[in-house]
Amino acid sequence: MKKVGYIAVFMAVIMVFASCFGNKTSNQVAETDSVAMEEEVLPDSTVYGVCGEGTSMHSLELVTDGGDTLTYEVMDEGSEENLVVGGLLAGDRLAVVGYVNGEKEHIASKVINLTTLQGKWMSIDKNFEIQEGGVVKSNIKAETNPWASWKIYNGQLLLNKDTFLIDELGADSLYLENKQGIFAFKRQK
């Protein structure tokens, strides 16, 4: 009778080990980089360059990083959002998102002045500096999730993995919007 008990216990132990080391499926959701997924789906259509001397109220001359000179038509009539944020000043670095219409004209749909965007910005809970080369320097040591990098992607500002629309960009104010709300920053001197 003792042998039957030992055999039953032995079989139970083998079944437990077999269930622990067998093929099992993971219920964990794999973490994915949402920005990397977007980049695979939608390539960045932003054109970078310097604002040219031929820029006027409704015409943007852009000397691209590749050396080409493109002329964009800037049509902001009827648009609810700001088409040009940060202003247009000859010599400033710009990020332009646009398209070519049926008449082979370049039409700008979003223009971001990167020279105006760079600098020190602060709000109630954030104090950071957007620097050249995609670097963000946080000036608050105790910040839980500081931004460390930035880039423009299809006319939107990416701070780390946070994506924002730039609602307004002026000499002393920056308004960023995402699904959590609108965030206001003022330029720190």
Spell out what each predicted region is.
Residues 97-99, 165-167, 171-186:
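Short, exposed beta-strand-loop hairpins at the edges of beta-sheets
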